[in-house]
Each structure stands twice: as structure tokens, then as C-alpha cells.
Amino acid sequence: GEQDAAVLYTTAQSSNVCIAFLQRDAENRWKVCQSIEGLADTVDNVRLAQLQDGGSMQMVVGYLASQGDSYLAVYSYENGQVSAILEQSYEQYLVEDITGGGNQDLILMSTLEDGGVQIELLTVDRDGSFQQVAVMGLSADKFSGCASVAAGLGADGKRYLVLDGWTGISGNNLATVLLRFDEESQQMIPADQISTSELYSASLRNVPNLVSRDLDGDGTVEIPTQPDEAGLLNMSQSRRMDFIVWMDYTSPTPEKSFGLLDEETNCYIELPAEWEGNLLLTDSTEIDAAVELRTVDENELVLTLRLVSASASAAGWTRLGVVASRQMQAKLGEGAVITDQTYRLSRSLYRLN
């Protein structure tokens, strides 16, 4: 029931960061119980996690070496004794109850020598023992590294892991892998709802920072896609925008959100789903630095978007929010038809930072 403390510090005698673990003595003074040397000269992140039974917490420390390599260490601290239960290089990691066992699990991503991605799971097995399992690898012919990892609940109530990997000739494109924890094999396996190859093709996208995320805060991680049929683009090259469809492939109706991505401000503007497939995005000829959405079949103006100074008046416009220190405003066209009663233009802006 007593709180302990951990202090990260450097000394002239060590090139790496050190960690001291402290407890209060009988006179309520802090006393160093044990000190250990870390794995590099810089600490990138620190967090506590409950990875084991018994109520004790583990400390997860991400280190960044001067040459740019990242290392992860997991320290177990009980009764004044510290032990390192994991020390290895990594690219991305996630602490989440992905197995559904009640404790948090550690999912670790690292790049193999051949360029593929290895996924490791640190969890408590059925016998209560702490184990590290190499759950699967992503082949080097498809992926060259890990961009991001997220976890969430699927539409079926199961826990899923969503991995975005670098791919393409340049290595700057993204594609997604969807995994779930299998109770019988105690391993992460590909999701049943869509094949790995189908998901790779569907999720292939050319925006490096467009990663999977829980877009609407419902606990499910949505996967962004750039389908050609979502809409047409006819605008200047100075403004990078594209139509995006966010998908939940664990659901029998996978499409969650349709809208417009503004790469310049890294924001997403949700649009009525009924507009998908019948939109043309073009520069406005009437309003400076604005863009218009028009119907493909009738060239009807349905929405105008513009970026103005944060203090500009929004009279006659709907203020969506402030992005990149500027105000995003929108105005529906006179011929715009929205049958979806749940859609609200004023709540359509999502910041993707």
C-alpha cells in the first residue's frame, strides 16, 4: 500500500541514463533501494503498466540512443528488488489488454534484418507465467518497417490489433494488417473478416502520416482508405487534399466515415455518406484560397471550404475549428441535400495530429 518512487538521472561515470528506485524508511525519508543502468543516453518515454498478476506495476522505459536506435526495457519492482524482464530494440510498442485476460499486455514491433516486421507479445499465459512470444512476422516483400500500432474492440466484441506498415518502392506508402488474439493457440492471427492480401490492397495509401486510429472515440480503431471511386479531384497542386473512407473491417457494414483529408493542416472533414462517389473537388473561382465540392452528375455546388485567420469573422459560414493556427470554415451550397439526420457540419472536423 506504500508508494515507491523512481528517479532517472545521469552521472559522469556512466554514458547511459540510470534509474534509482526509492522507498520511505521508518522515519518517512526517501531511501535508495537499488540503482540500475539504462540502455541508452536518452529516455524517450516512461510509463507504468500492470503486466503481471498480483497487483504490482511494471515500469516500461523507451530509450533513444545517440545513433537513432530505440531500445525498450521492462522493469519489475517488488519488495525493493528490481529485475529487468525485457531489454531489446524496438520501433513501436503498445501497452493494452489485447488478450482479454484482465492484465495489460505489451505488443512490440521491430524490423528484422531482411526488412520485414516482427510482432512480439509479452503476456501472462494460462498458467500465470510471464512469457514473451514471437507472434508473427510481416514479410519483407510487402513491408519495410512499422509506422504505427493501435488496439481496440471490434464490432464482434473481440480485441484487435491494427498495424500500419511502411510499404511501396519508396517505402513512404502505408498499408494495414488486422490481427486478433486467438485463445486456443495463444497467438495473434489475421482477422477472419477480410484476407490479408485484400486488406493490403484496400488500405494501400500514399499519405505517410495517415495512420489508423479510433477516429470517433467509440473504442474501435478505424482504417483509412483512399478508394479511387470515392470522388474526383481537379485542383491546383499547391493544395494536397483527397477523399478518404474510414473502415471497420470487423463489422458486416465496414464503412464508418467518408470525408476529405487536408494534408496541409492534417485534418479530416467528415462529409455526408450519401455524397460518396458523386463529388468533384475543385478550386473555387469566386473565393480566394477556397475549395469547392460539386456533384459530378449536375455540377451542383454542395460545399465550400476555406482557411482564414483565427480571428476572422464567420458570418455566413459554419466555423469548423482552428487548425494550424487558422480557422477552417465551411458553407453549404444552396442545392446541397443531406438526408442523414445525424450529420452535423459543425462537428465534422477531426484533427489528426
Language-model features: locations:
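Extracytosolic low-complexity repeat regions of secreted or lipid-anchored proteins
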Residues: 231, 312-339
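Surface-exposed amphipathic alpha-helical segments
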Residues: 279, 330-353
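Alpha-helix initiation/capping motif
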Residues: 11, 253, 295, 307-309, ...
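Secondary-structure transition/turn motif
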Residues: 90, 166, 228, 294-299, ...
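Beta-propeller-forming repeat regions
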Residues: 1-284, 349-352
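A broad, low-specificity signal marking well-ordered, structured residues that form hydrophobic/aromatic
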Residues: 269, 291, 328
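Secretory pathway targeting signatures of secreted, lumenal, and periplasmic proteins
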Residues: 274-320
